[in-house]
């Protein structure tokens, strides 16, 4: 029987999606953010190095500006995200401070990690922050990112961004929190007999074909982007856990080896009992 072993994991990237931070009503889930800050601070106190990739700028902005739905106009989307990013970081800073943990903000665009000079700079920034015991909180710089073909600077969504961050920081593990329990063999919202995949060693065409669907009205990510992120993690010889973010304390249980979520790790590196 395969056993998850995370004893040697030191550097962890945790990605949390908008659906985990914003309630269905559009209000901010303060309890969830507090639990997340507690878990990350606890890990830091145990000697772990944690980087948080956080969506939510759009959700926070919609809440602050009392908007019912995401604007369709790009400029307005960027404006809402810009307002929301400030509010989100302010809240993170306040709540993490309660646990005596300092945070910083890193906003990225895709071109930053494409060019060697800027990639070296951002890598050094991560290393400096981590060495100071600070939790870098990463998001895409939505206010300036564009996806036009002649000057594409968007990552697409924060699922992919988290995989990129895990790669450039050489993280031991990416934990992706979502509103789903993990990867199923078929759509659990349609098929009652859908089974959760505990371990995925190879991203097959069958898995890619079965993944799809849109994210929530507040976010952009779906299952396909999570599968693509796992593929990126595999290319960097890393590992990833996709799990439900309803209870952030489950992160601690996963690191203890409990079989929550779906573990993405290539088979040649898997240990057996």
Curated annotation (Swiss-Prot):
Localization, UniProt: Cytoplasm
A single MF term (Gene Ontology): ATP binding
Family the entry assigns: Belongs to the glutamate 5-kinase family.
InterPro entries according to UniProt: AceGlu_kinase-like_sf, Asp/Glu/Uridylate_kinase, G5K_ProB, Glu/AcGlu_kinase, Glu_5kinase, Glu_5kinase/COase_Synthase, Glutamate_5-kinase_CS
Listed EC numbers: 2.7.2.11
Catalytic reactions of this protein: L-glutamate + ATP = L-glutamyl 5-phosphate + ADP
Gene3D superfamilies per UniProt: Acetylglutamate kinase-like
Protein purpose: Catalyzes the transfer of a phosphate group to glutamate to form L-glutamate 5-phosphate.
HAMAP family recorded: ProB
UniProt binding sites for ATP: 15, 178-179, 220-226
Gene Ontology cellular component annotations, sorted alphabetically: cytosol
Main location: cytoplasm
Residues binding substrate, per UniProt: 55, 142, 158
NCBIfam families: proB (TIGR01027)
Keyword vocabulary terms for this entry: Amino-acid biosynthesis, ATP-binding, Cytoplasm, Kinase, Nucleotide-binding, Proline biosynthesis, Transferase
Pathway per the UniProt entry: Amino-acid biosynthesis; L-proline biosynthesis; L-glutamate 5-semialdehyde from L-glutamate: step 1/2
A single GO BP: L-proline biosynthetic process
The name this protein goes by in its record: Glutamate 5-kinase
């Amino acid at each position: 029987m395969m056993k998850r072993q995370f004893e040697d994991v030191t550097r962890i990237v945790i990605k949390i999606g908008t659906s985990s931070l914003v309630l269905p009503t559009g209000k901010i889930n303060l309890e969830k953010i507090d639990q997340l800050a507690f878990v990350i601070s606890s890990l830091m106190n145990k000697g772990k190095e944690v980087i948080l990739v956080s969506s939510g700028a759009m959700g926070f902005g919609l809440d602050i500006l009392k908007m019912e739905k995401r604007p369709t106009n790009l400029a307005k989307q960027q404006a809402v995200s810009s307002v929301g990013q400030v509010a989100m970081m302010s809240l993170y800073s306040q709540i993490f401070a309660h646990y005596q943990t300092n945070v910083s903000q890193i906003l990225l665009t895709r071109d930053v990690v494409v060019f060697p000079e800027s990639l070296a700079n951002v890598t050094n920034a991560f290393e400096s922050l981590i060495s100071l015991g600070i939790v870098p909180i990463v998001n895409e710089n939505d206010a300036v990112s564009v996806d036009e073909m002649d000057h594409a600077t968007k990552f697409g969504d924060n699922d992919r961004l988290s995989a990129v961050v895990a790669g450039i920081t050489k993280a031991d593990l990416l934990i992706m929190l979502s509103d789903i329990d993990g990867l199923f063999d078929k759509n659990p919202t349609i098929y009652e007999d859908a089974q959760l995949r505990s371990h995925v060693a190879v991203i097959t065409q069958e898995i890619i074909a079965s993944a799809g669907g849109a994210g929530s009205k507040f976010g952009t990510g779906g299952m396909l982007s999570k599968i693509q992120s796992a593929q990126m993690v595999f290319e960097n010889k890393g590992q990833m856990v996709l799990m439900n973010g309803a209870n952030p304390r489950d992160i601690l249980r996963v690191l203890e080896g409990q079989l929550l979520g779906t573990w993405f790790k290539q088979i040649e590196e898997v240990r057996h009992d």
